[in-house]
């Protein structure tokens, strides 16, 4: 154990909380003078609201002139590029057309291509027949159904019957592109959203996101579409519903090849969604959106002045009020740019998804802007196909069918291995360089100052020790609850054991046997709850069981606002160390930090005067 003297330190924990979070037996070991189970989430949401308010001020100013509006949109686009990350060099798509299914007035081509080496993408191309080529075309980006493109798409059939080709793309984790599968290709997770969430955690460690990777695959799908002589490259659209609506929103602002778009059953405001239901699954978020003041309507606004349609249901779980507020911004934007007719919204007496009425409006919108045709939508035959006949792969999954296929997990491991030498080079740099980069990753602009306020909240005298309760307050941060155990045998040289554990301090203190030996040895015990643990643990029912653990919603909100939980908890540790430096019972005593059921790699930066023993 290292002993730190004169220790103004920064303890940075890099890693993840693992294991099942257990509700602490707090009871008499509560140190906060208040009780509010959702306090931590409320604290985080204040930043969400502040960021949204700042964004509102900026967009209202942009609405005052066309030049201001264009400047706002370009600013959104540049900030979006920063958070979506970089993409690989384009390589050969290695397209394979593996089959053809005949429909009524159209045919479906079954196609496989590589968006990057080893990443196979399965698609269906609904191609209208008896049409003058080249024809207009659109991408259909799939919602969250586990079967992805599945056995058929009613919207694609309707589009094809009206002279518009449709390329339906299997996203990562759906259709024939499941990643978490057994040797036979059977899914190991509960639905697409669970797989998306688990895969996104791995992507986040590499500085990207599942949403960004979906963008890349969709971009390459459009690249393929434009290689075809029977497709008109000047008449291209994109649409999607639910998770496909998410993909559409994230896609359209960065690809000028898209001339018309429609977002169904996704469009609302992020602020409103986080308030009502909390963060969604892993493909629905790109880290730091809030920090960069990017709202869901901003991704749609980047489509302007190209035609855009919003499709909503009055009884959708996607909040209609937020959708209406966002659409009002779209209307204002398009009006300022002089093209109010190029944005529209349909709200129907239904819930989630792309139902009949929405499909009719969708095809009508695309006919108008891709074909200059406002005639009534032609009905399509409701053809039915067997799922087995519609598969592009021999075994139903690319990762067990295609030679050289790489799972997303293997891709990520390969990327980590590729970066190994870069990590070694980085760690050879000076302390200040490393510290600056770590602070950036943790969402800390700088180390907090020493200013904390110590509030005593309770005191109990026991036979062998005195028990003191405190809440430690640092401006702008969550208060840190802690309990100090001063044994009767303590002296000027007694070490302080600062104990931090996943279950909270109450679990440790509720069993006398846990600390009896420390009392006998005269050790001073300081037990505390880092934010989101112990006294401020988020109630489990606010996070769906399919997500990581009960910390999911607060972890995702923290990433959204640009303040990862790990960085926030580093500030809590600093607050505790400042407490040890300032409180009359503790100043001058050596401090040892124990992490229990918290997996950390500890990096400690010390003042020049600090001494290690």
PLM feature segments, named:
Residues 1-8:
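Positively charged n-region of N-terminal signal peptides that target proteins for export
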Residues 9-21:
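Bacterial N-terminal signal peptides
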Residues 24-120, 304, 311-497, 503-510, ...:
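Alpha/beta-hydrolase-fold serine-hydrolase catalytic core, especially in secreted/extracellular enzymes
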Residues 126, 169, 239-241, 246, ...:
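Generic beta-strand/beta-sheet core signal
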Residues 132-227, 268-279, 285, 491-583:
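Cap/lid segment of the alpha/beta-hydrolase catalytic domain
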Residues 134-137, 162-165, 232-235, 256-260, ...:
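Loop/turn elements at helix/coil->beta-strand transitions in domains of secreted/extracellular proteins
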Residues 197-198, 204-205, 259-301, 305, ...:
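Mobile cap/lid helix-loop segments that gate and shape the active-site cleft of serine hydrolases
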Residues 220-292, 576-613:
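Primarily recognizes the serine-hydrolase "nucleophile elbow" in alpha/beta-hydrolase
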């Amino acid at each position: 154990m290292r002993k730190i003297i004169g220790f103004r330190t920064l303890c940075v924990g890099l890693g993840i909380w693992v294991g099942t979070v257990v509700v602490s037996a707090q009871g008499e070991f509560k140190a906060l003078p208040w009780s509010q189970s959702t306090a931590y989430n409320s604290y985080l949401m204040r930043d969400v609201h502040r960021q949204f308010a700042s964004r509102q001020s900026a967009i209202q100013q942009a609405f005052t002139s066309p030049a201001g509006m264009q400047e706002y949109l370009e600013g959104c686009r540049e900030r979006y590029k920063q958070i979506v990350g970089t993409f690989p060099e384009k390589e050969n798509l290695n397209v394979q057309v593996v089959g053809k299914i005949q429909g009524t007035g159209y045919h479906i081509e079954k196609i496989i291509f590589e968006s990057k080496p080893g990443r196979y993408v399965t698609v269906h191309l609904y191609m209208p027949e008896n049409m003058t080529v080249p024809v207009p075309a659109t991408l259909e980006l799939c919602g969250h159904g586990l079967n992805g493109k599945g056995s058929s798409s009613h919207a694609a059939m309707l589009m094809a019957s009206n002279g518009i080709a449709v390329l339906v793309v299997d996203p990562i984790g759906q259709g024939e592109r499941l990643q978490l599968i057994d040797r036979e290709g059977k899914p190991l997770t509960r639905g697409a959203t669970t797989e998306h969430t688990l895969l996104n955690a791995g992507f986040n460690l590499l500085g990207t996101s599942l949403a960004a990777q979906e963008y890349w695959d969709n971009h390459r799908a459009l690249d393929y579409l434009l290689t075809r002589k029977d497709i008109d490259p000047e008449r291209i659209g994109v649409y999607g519903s639910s998770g496909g609506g998410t993909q559409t929103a994230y896609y359209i602002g960065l690809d000028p090849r898209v001339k018309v778009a429609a977002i169904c059953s996704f469009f609302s405001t992020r602020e409103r969604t986080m308030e009502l239901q909390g963060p969604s699954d892993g493909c629905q978020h790109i880290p730091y959106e809030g920090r960069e003041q990017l709202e869901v309507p901003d991704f749609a606004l980047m489509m302007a002045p190209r035609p855009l349609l919003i499709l909503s249901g009055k009884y959708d779980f996607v909040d209609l009020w937020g959708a209406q507020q966002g659409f009002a911004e779209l209307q204002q934007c398009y009006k300022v740019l002089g093209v109010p007719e190029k944005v529209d919204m349909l709200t129907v007496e239904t819930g989630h998804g792309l139902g009949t009425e929405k499909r009719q409006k969708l095809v009508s919108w695309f006919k108008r802007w891709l074909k200059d045709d406002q005639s009534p939508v032609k009905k399509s035959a409701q053809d039915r196909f067997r799922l087995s006949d519609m598969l592009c792969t021999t075994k139903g999954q690319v990762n067990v069918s295609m030679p050289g296929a790489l799972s997303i997990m293997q891709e990520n491991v390969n990327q980590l291995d590729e970066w190994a030498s870069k990590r070694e080079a980085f760690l050879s740099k000076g302390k200040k360089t490393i510290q600056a980069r770590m602070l950036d990753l943790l969402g800390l602009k700088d180390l907090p100052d020493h200013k904390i306020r110590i509030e005593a909240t309770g005191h109990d005298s026991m036979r062998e020790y005195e028990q003191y309760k405190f809440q430690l307050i640092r401006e702008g941060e969550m208060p840190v609850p802690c309990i100090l155990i001063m044994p009767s045998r303590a002296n000027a040289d007694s070490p302080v054991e600062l104990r931090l554990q996943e279950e909270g301090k109450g679990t440790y203190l509720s069993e006398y046997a846990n600390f009896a030996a420390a009392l006998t040895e005269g050790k001073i015990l300081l037990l505390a709850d880092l934010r989101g643990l112990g006294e401020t643990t988020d109630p489990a029912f606010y996070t769906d069981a399919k997500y990581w653990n009960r910390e999911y919603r607060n972890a995702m909100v923290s990433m959204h606002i640009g303040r990862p939980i790990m960085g926030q908890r580093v500030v809590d540790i600093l607050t505790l160390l400042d407490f040890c430096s300032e409180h009359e019972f503790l100043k001058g005593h050596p401090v040892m930090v124990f992490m229990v059921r918290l997996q950390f790699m500890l990096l400690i930066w010390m003042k020049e005067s600090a001494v290690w023993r």
